[in-house]
């Protein structure tokens, strides 16, 4: 029996999924992705597979330039619960990157969640506070919680861009800033960038990621709703009813496809509203009302703010 436990300790269960390369090549091979403006990239399409499931549970597109580590460009979950990453729109991302390349000065620094930071650095050629694959939070169904360590190890090996201890600490500080009260959060962001001109990019899906890392500050949930005849406004009664029945205070929407919308619900805690919650377009308030940072651009689920200088 002791020998068996020793074996399990030295040979832990592997990650419950694997990345399977389906297709790889230059941008021209993936003309439907809309990446013509980045001809120097090599694109890889991967299916995320589980041995016991016939179909992939997700599809990922990653990009590389030269010998640099790969960057996740797009993720499509094929099951109801997010796995690995959250669904995103590549067309929104490329439009965002084009706007940043055009309007954000070369000498400025961009702050964003680490995955968006790597995308901005690759597509917009701008300096970002985070450059590594920090891998937080680990997004996995509850029945995989016992294999979080194996998942983290597999992800580090696959993406080949582990962070330094300093960058990991800086990211924790960044997360704390977003989860703080608005004025305190901005002051913390200013400490991170010093005297540099700085811009902050947030996306509605960051609400889910921040809620996983700071649940005591951001009590949230999400639910997908079918979209009929492309009528988003027609969803309002259904979404509001779910919100009321589950005791949430407000919601924000993300378009997943022409047939589905995801609603993110937020419950205000006793600690007050976070800086991040102020930056998102909830139905009862808009980011335009936020005074502590300057809204400079919005496209789809992305919102760009200029952080005031110290």
Model-derived regions, located:
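Hydrophobic membrane-insertion alpha-helices, especially the h-region
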Residues: 1-9
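Extracytoplasmic
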Residues: 14-310
């Amino acid at each position: 029996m002791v020998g068996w436990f020793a074996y399990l300790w030295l040979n832990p269960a592997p990650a419950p999924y694997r990345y399977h390369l389906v297709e790889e090549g230059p941008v021209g091979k993936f003309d439907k992705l809309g990446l013509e403006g980045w001809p120097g990239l090599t694109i890889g399409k991967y299916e995320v597979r589980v041995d016991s499931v016939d179909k992939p549970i997700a599809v990922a597109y990653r990009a590389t330039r030269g010998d640099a580590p790969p960057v996740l460009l797009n993720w499509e979950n094929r099951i109801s619960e997010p796995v690995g990453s959250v669904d995103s729109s590549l067309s929104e991302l490329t439009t965002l990157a084009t706007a940043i390349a055009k309007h954000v000065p070369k000498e400025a620094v961009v702050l964003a969640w680490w995955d968006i930071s790597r995308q901005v650095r690759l597509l917009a050629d701008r300096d970002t506070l985070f450059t590594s694959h920090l891998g937080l939070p680990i997004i996995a169904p509850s029945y995989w919680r016992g294999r979080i360590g194996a998942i983290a190890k597999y992800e580090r090996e696959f993406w080949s861009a582990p962070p330094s201890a300093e960058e990991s600490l800086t990211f924790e500080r960044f997360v704390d800033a977003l989860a703080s009260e608005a004025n305190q959060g901005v002051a913390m962001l200013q400490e991170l960038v010093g005297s540099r001109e700085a811009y902050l990019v947030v996306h509605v899906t960051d609400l889910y990621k921040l809620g996983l890392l700071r649940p005591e500050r951001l009590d949230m949930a999400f639910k997908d709703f079918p979209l009929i005849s492309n009528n988003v406004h027609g969803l309002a009664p259904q979404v509001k009813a779910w919100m009321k029945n589950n005791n949430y205070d407000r919601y924000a929407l993300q378009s997943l496809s022409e047939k589905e919308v995801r609603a993110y619900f937020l419950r205000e805690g006793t600690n007050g509203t976070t800086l991040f919650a102020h930056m998102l377009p909830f139905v009862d308030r808009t980011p335009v009302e936020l005074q502590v940072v300057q809204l400079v651009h919005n496209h789809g689920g992305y919102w760009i703010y200029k952080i005031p200088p110290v």
